[in-house]
A protein has these predicted regions:
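Short catalytic/ligand-binding loop motif for oxyanion handling, primarily in non-cytosolic enzymes
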Residues: 55, 72, 105-108, 156-160, ...
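C-terminal target-recognition/interaction regions appended to catalytic cores
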Residues: 245-343
Length: 343
């Protein structure tokens, strides 16, 4: 069931990233937190508390704030001059930040028709990002809590470009524990992975994320280092300057979820097309067939690059292109141990 604030219309919900957090996910977040921390010794703060789902537990000191004046909480813009005193918290007070901060990627094609680009509120320059969720993570680092336990898109961590955008946050916090769940708990739009993430003081780099083993709600785990990716073998984005003799054109690729929505081979050249050289054609054919099985693999792969087992693929490449059964066996082995819906 999708739950949004009743006093907000659809456009306002999108612009504010305002989706309530189901109770079972709040409980999951606190279980994750309590595995590592005696929370009774800390003040709990949610700087985008919405309906205050994360603050309904019995706790000695809990503070909620939101930019929405109808939330019944402190009316504070968490992204403008964030500091502890805004919330009545002492500098030496043990602090844990909890919650489900807004997610709103203004560069996304999703819901562009209802996003209001004139919807603005003040954001400090060093917190600005194309995504509100990343801005919130940066703001948390300024408040210097001992722990941070929040929900956010898994793509903030597993996509290297997004990870680099974390800046101050990744330089001062490290991922301690995590649990991956589906966005279907919040929205009917394209499914993508969300992580309930617990951070502690420290620092992390992208190599740490690649090694991290993420438990999922499918009773499986996801580790980026367990797989090889098509970007190691082909260009994913326009490459006219790199390819001379061109044998075809391909739609640009972002991740597996984008591949589900978009075309593969193009009948005619486009300005933003990927140019295909003869020696790379086999890999683009691989991507074309990967698109067929993409809806059948678990949602938590959605923000990853197209996965390949290169040596195994090259051994069977001719049969792979000709025989659907060969392709099916290859993909079954590639995703062995994960709950797929192959025929």
């Amino acid at each position: 069931m999708i739950r949004t604030p009743k006093h907000l219309n659809k456009r306002e919900s999108v612009n504010l990233g305002a989706y309530y957090t189901p109770c079972y996910l709040v409980d999951c977040a606190y279980r994750l937190l309590k595995k590592h921390v005696s929370i009774e010794d800390y003040t709990l703060l949610d700087t985008a508390c919405g309906n205050k789902e994360f603050l309904k537990l019995h706790h000695p000191k809990k503070i909620g704030a939101d930019i929405d004046p109808n939330c019944g909480a402190l009316i504070i813009n968490a992204l403008a001059n964030p500091k502890r005193e805004n919330y009545g918290i002492n500098q030496d007070e043990p602090l844990i930040i909890v919650g489900n901060p807004p997610y709103n990627d203004r560069t996304s094609f999703i819901k562009q028709d209802i996003k209001n680009k004139d919807f603005t509120f003040e954001i400090d320059n060093d917190l600005k990002s194309r995504d509100l969720g990343i801005s919130f993570l940066r703001s948390f680092a300024i408040l210097k809590p001992a722990f941070i336990c929040v929900l956010h898109p898994l793509s903030y961590l597993i996509k290297e470009a997004n990870f680099k955008q974390l800046k101050l946050f990744k330089d001062n916090y490290r991922l301690l524990d995590a649990f991956v769940v589906s966005s279907k708990s919040f929205t009917k739009s394209n499914e993508f992975p969300i992580v309930i993430a617990l951070y502690e003081r420290g620092r992390m780099d992208y190599a740490d994320i690649r090694r991290f083993i993420f438990p999922t709600d499918c009773d499986t785990t996801l580790c980026l280092n367990d797989f090889d990716y098509i970007a190691n073998y082909v260009d994913k984005y326009p490459n006219a300057k790199k390819v001379g003799a061109c044998v075809g054109y391909f739609f640009p690729m972002r991740d597996i979820n984008a591949l589900k929505r978009n075309k593969t081979f193009l009948n005619a050249p486009r300005e933003n097309a990927v140019r295909i050289s003869q020696d790379k054609l086999i890999y683009y054919q691989y991507i074309h067939y990967f698109k067929e099985i993409a809806p059948k693999i678990p949602y938590y792969f959605g923000n990853l690059d197209i996965i390949i087992e290169n040596s195994a693929f090259l051994e069977i490449k001719d049969a792979f292109l000709k025989d659907k059964r060969v392709r099916l066996e290859y993909f079954k082995k590639l995703f062995q141990g994960h709950p797929c819906e192959f025929d």
